[in-house]
Amino acid sequence: MTRLFIVYNPRSSRYLDVKQEVLSRAKELNGYLVGKYEVTDAHIDDNITKLSKLLEDGDVVLSAGGDATAIIAVNAILKSGKDVTLSVLPYGNFNDLARTLRTRNFDDVFLSDALVRNFYPLEIIVDGKFFRYSTCYVTIGMMAESVGLYNEPKMRRKLKKKFGRQISSYTQLASWYFKNRRNRIFLPEFKLNGVLQPKKSSDYAAVNGRSMARVMKGGEDYRDPQFFRHQVDRLANFYRLVVLMSRSILSRIPGTATDGDIIEFTNPSTVAIQAEGEGATFENVKTIEIRKGKKCLKVIEN
C-alpha cells in the first residue's frame, strides 16, 4: 500500500479549506496509507529536516498550502534522497508551483489522467554552501526583501479574510515599494558571470516555472535539466517596473537562457534572497550561485 503524506500548515490563511477539501477527502482514498505532516512554527529548515526523516521509497507527498508549504515538501524530498513523488494543491496566495503543475484540486491529483514527470529545480549556493532548492523562481535584491512583508502580523490577519486577499496583498506590496525603493541599495555592485552589471540594478531573478508571483508568466524550463532564464533590472525605477510587469503579464517575463549563474559582489555585501516567497538575508556575502540542481523531482502534473 502506498504511503501518502499530506503536508499542511494549520496557521495558514486557508487552513479550513485544506481541512474540508483535502484532509477529509483523503480518508476516502483507496490504496493509500494516509499520514499527515503539520508544519510547525519552527524555522523552515527544521521542518525540512523533520519531514525528510519520515520519507521512504515509494511515498507520495501532497503539499496542500501555498508555495511556502510546497518548498518545505520539495526540499524535504530532495534531502531525503528517497524515491518520492510530489503533488501540490493551491491553498496559498500565489501558488506558483501548483500553477506550473496545473493541479487545481484533489481530483486533478488522484482521479484524473495526471502524469508523473521529472521536474528539474534550481539550486541556490551562497559562498560555496548549499542554501535551498527552488522550483519556480529565485529573486535577489529588492523583490526578495519585500517578501518579509508577508510575515508581519497585520498582513497575516488580512490574508486570513475570505475575500479581498489578493487585492490587499498587492496594495501592501505597492505601499512598501514606494516607501522603500529609494531608501537604500538593494544589490551592491556585482558581476554576473564575470560581467559587471549596470549601476542601480536592484534585482536579479532566475525563472524556472510557468508563473512568478501569480500574475507574471514564465515558461517550461523546469522540464529542462540544464537551462533556465535570468534577468537583471533596475526595478527601483518605477517606469522600468511598469514595463517589466506589463511584459510579464501580457507576454512572458523577459530574460536570457543560461545554464548557470555566478553572482560576485565587488565587496562583501548584505543581500536578501528568496525562493517562492521564503526569504532570508545574508551578511558579508561574496558569491551566490544559481544552477539546475543535480537531483530532479518526480511530480504529478496535469
Where are these regions (language model features)?
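Short acidic/glycine-rich loop or secondary-structure boundary segments that cap or lie
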Residues: 143-146, 199-200, 211-216, 238-239
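Helix N-cap/beta->alpha junction signal
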Residues: 65-66, 139
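ATP/nucleoside-binding phosphotransfer catalytic cores, i.e., glycine-rich phosphate-binding loops
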Residues: 192, 196-198, 217-302
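ATP/NTP phosphate-donor binding region
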Residues: 1-64, 71, 75-76, 103, ...
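Glycine-rich phosphate/pyrophosphate-binding beta-alpha loops
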Residues: 205-217, 279
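Short hydrophobic segments within beta-strands
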Residues: 7-9, 89, 207
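Catalytic core of DAGKc-family lipid kinases
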Residues: 16, 80-203
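Glycine-rich beta-alpha junction loops
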Residues: 11, 138-142, 207-211
